């Protein structure tokens, strides 16, 4: 049985990671029995980017969980697709948790603060891992989970996790029978362990950055969204992060309350819709109608729990 790995996934977005140990970080599961296959029962064909199961059982279903590189930052890809950008260099995500990247990022932050003395609020967008956002070959959104942790993994991070919890990481902790631990699932102990580990590690690195910002006499603001996995503001670890303020996109009343109810920050800001993007601001578009609808859906939430500031975002 041959299972092609990249079918239905944008090759602009991802690349199979066959550099790190496949036997350790990949998993082939017989979904009919629920049991993982021994690593000796399958192999990877790099030429076709496929996993080959040598002796599959008749009528059984099999899945492959594998590591992949994000070779185009999904938010940048989203913006490029929505705005129909042409000939734009693809921005790549990088793992700030890696020691060399960690040191480089802190140095760049200090350089920015020293060269921008007129800035009094530094807005981070965000810290450091993106939610799950996958595109298919036609650049359509294939799977989106604003709370998904699947893009926050690397062998470096997973090895640290194993040392802390004392047991072997399995891809299935995140894959979750194909449900990817979406918010309608009851999380397993292992997945909650991984979330808690990520929050602690992210909060510690956030505190390093906010301490630097404060040392230069400036406030640290966080955008609620995008690369926000591990810094969920209602979890206890966030209170140790040193963030002064929150700004987030207002889709409706519930997302406004998600911003305005955040405890422990000096002020909150809502970014109302529409974004100033060409998908709304174009010949025949009606941004006024969208703005009114957004306001009507959010205003009752403001009465119940006000935000401190209102703004808009985007670029044309």
Region roles according to the model:
Residues 1-240:
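Polysaccharide-binding and catalytic clefts of secreted carbohydrate-active enzymes
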Residues 110, 123-127, 132-134, 184-185, ...:
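Hydrophobic targeting/anchoring helices
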